[in-house]
Amino acid sequence: MRCRTRQRISERSQACVVKVSACSYSVCMATNLDELNAQSAYAPLPPIFAKLGLAYDDVLLLPNETDVIPSEVDTSTHLTRKIVMKAPVLSAAMDTVTESEMAIAMARNGGIGVLHRNLSIDDQAAQVDVVKRSESGMITDPLTVNPEVTLADLDKLCGKFHISGLPVVDKENKLVGIITNRDMRFIASEDYDTLKVKDVMTKENLVTGPSNISKDDAHRLLAQHKVEKLPLVDEEGHLTGLITVKDFVKTEQYPDATKDEQGRLRVAAGVGFLGDAWQRASALMEAGVDVLVVDTANGEARLALDMISRLKHDSAFDGVQIIGGNVGTRSGAQAMIEAGADAVKVGIGPGSICTTRIVAGVGVPQLTAVYEAAQACRAAGVPCIADGGIHYSGDIAKALVAGASSVMLGGTLAGCEEAPGEKVLLHGKQYKLYRGMGSLGAMAPRGKKSYSKDRYFQADVTSSDKVVPEGVEGEVPYRGPLNAVLYQMLGGLHQSMFYIGAHNIAEMPERGKFIRITDAGLRESHPHDIVMTTEAPNYSGFHNN
């Protein structure tokens, strides 16, 4: 009798092993997150529970048959309905990540920067202007200087816009000369306050071109006369434009740069939806911004959706694309689309400096959030931007396979030279300050106003000690110039496209298949059983601490 009982127990145990093995095998063969969710070993949950939420670290991509060469893949993608980028990356609208220097570097490397809004309207509009003037096929409204201006004032103007010289015009906008750093090279700085532009400018034998000059003819004139700036004038001598030799050099140096129809670098900027948000949006539009990002912690807020709709229905903003965010669900993305958004930004709390999921208990693990939102976006032909949670280049690939068109990077870029965060030395290593826009520091007043509190719906909180933060402040390792960081991040994406057999971004959701992994699988994926002596440029254990 005892033997028969043992036999039955043994048979039941074997059956359980077979059942678990079959389940494990089916998970390995899953093609998308819906299938992964359906394979849960748990009993069905009541309706109040959503499906299983997965983060990037919960999955890997399965290798696939491939004829792809990593160096030949096409990483171009739609940022919005109308704007295409060569690299599927944006820098985050954070005050320790993106100001004009980062935005310029991002656009030159094929992505785009989103200027943060934690500053005055005039200052943010000036940042847009700096980016748009940084290079151009032809500057149609060049900065100019009056002959009566002192060299001291001229020097300040050139320093502000990082330029080496300016056309000199009279009150009727007629060209009367040009002044460059060559004209000022041998003038003592103590004379800058007394000498005027007219005293040192070049006014004889000016090399100019007609308003309708071709690019090739302009290049020929610059080379023939060995000058760096070519003012363009009409028949009456009025200044109509300016072409510089540096723009030809930069076009060759940065062939994948994200540019507008006039050859200027593209730039995006964040706006809110309360208070002076409309005045901010209007000022940014007048400064030449290409994309406005209606930037809030919960994109499903009625006021945020109304702001998107208002911008899309105002003809003054016809030349500006509108991105809405952030959302974490399919229904949230659908609401953005119905409001008229040209792209939807996805991410509720995945960032390394965000505490929303802990403080508010709200959020969606990022891989699931991207996958769900992408279902609505794909059906409507609207690009989806995965914002946050990217630690390594492999995470970019996972986001794109899940349906994102591009990714937004914050902490990954905060350590770059171009990021505005302060550089500090800690234990003999260099770091840069990085903070969430929901941190106490970011929401603190700047002068008489706080520009970040309304992102977290706390604009009505007048006392700093009453603010409920949804972010933290810290430091990230200094990583050097942006182009080196992006080279490694995009290089990893190229390798991923090779492994899954995708020639371009559009093929990634079709070719990519996820396998869900355990904690042991994640540990096995990272370097293990070794003491690292030299860090690779694309891998650091920093995120695992």
From Swiss-Prot:
Its cofactor is K(+). One of its GO terms (molecular function) is metal ion binding. Its EC number is 1.1.1.205. Residues 138-194, 201-258 form the CBS domain. One of its GO terms (biological process) is GTP biosynthetic process. K(+) binds at residues 349, 351, 354, 524-526. Keywords: CBS domain, GMP biosynthesis, Metal-binding, NAD, Oxidoreductase, Potassium, Purine biosynthesis, Repeat. InterPro entries: Aldolase_TIM, CBS_dom, CBS_dom_sf, IMP_DH, IMP_DH/GMP_Rdtase_CS, IMP_DH_GMPRt. Mycophenolic acid (MPA) is a non-competitive inhibitor that prevents formation of the closed enzyme conformation by binding to the same site as the amobile flap. In contrast, mizoribine monophosphate (MZP) is a competitive inhibitor that induces the closed conformation. MPA is a potent inhibitor of mammalian IMPDHs but a poor inhibitor of the bacterial enzymes. MZP is a more potent inhibitor of bacterial IMPDH. It holds the Pfam family CBS. Belongs to the IMPDH/GMPR family. This is Inosine-5'-monophosphate dehydrogenase. It comes from Bifidobacterium longum (strain NCC 2705). The lineage of its organism: Bacteria, Bacillati, Actinomycetota, Actinomycetes, Bifidobacteriales.
